[in-house]
């Protein structure tokens, strides 16, 4: 029995060495605490696009999926994914500018490729002073404007 536990642990460690990106990136669904930052990221996408060209390294990428269904909690005001989609449509010029800027910078383009994020999925972003990205995305099947 001890050998089985040791093997499972060894496989877990070996898997993280073979595919480190699977361990480093986490997807999260939008929660109550993400609502305001999500709307802010979408509404300010155009101004945040201007900061992308100065990014020289991306130490981490966090992803918040806007279209993962959530179970509403009592007193929760988490919008539906359709409301986020409407916000993207209203701010489409800024969102498009952000997507183009992320693809124009080779460092951010490589980070998106590493985590298999298609630019058409991106609705908004937060950019830290160190270059870390927190991306607010839609699933591939919800990327149409």
Locate predicted features.
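Amphipathic, charged alpha-helical segments and their helix-to-coil junctions
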Residues: 115-145
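Short amphipathic alpha-helical surface micro-motifs
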Residues: 42-47, 104-107, 115-120
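Solvent-exposed, non-transmembrane amphipathic alpha-helical segments
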Residues: 21, 72-75, 118, 131-132
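Mature extracytoplasmic domains of secretory-pathway proteins
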Residues: 62-114
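N-terminal leader/targeting segments
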Residues: 2-71
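Surface-exposed patches in mature extracellular/periplasmic domains of secreted proteins
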Residues: 51-59, 63, 110-114, 120-127
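Short N-terminal helix-initiation segments at or just after the protein's N-terminus
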Residues: 30-39, 79-85, 140-141
């Amino acid at each position: 029995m001890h050998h089985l536990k040791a093997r499972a642990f060894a496989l877990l460690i070996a898997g993280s060495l073979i595919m480190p990106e699977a361990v480093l990136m986490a997807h999260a669904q939008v929660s109550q605490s993400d609502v305001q930052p999500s709307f802010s990221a979408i509404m300010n996408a155009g101004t945040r696009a201007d900061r992308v060209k100065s990014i020289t390294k991306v130490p981490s990428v966090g992803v918040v999926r806007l279209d993962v269904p959530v179970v509403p909690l009592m007193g929760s005001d988490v919008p539906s994914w359709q409301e986020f989609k409407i916000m993207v449509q209203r701010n489409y010029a800024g969102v498009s500018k952000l997507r183009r800027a992320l693809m124009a910078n080779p460092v951010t383009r490589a980070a998106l490729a590493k985590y298999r994020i298609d630019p058409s999925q991106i609705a908004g972003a937060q950019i830290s002073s160190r270059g870390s990205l927190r991306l607010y995305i839609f699933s591939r099947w919800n990327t149409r404007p």
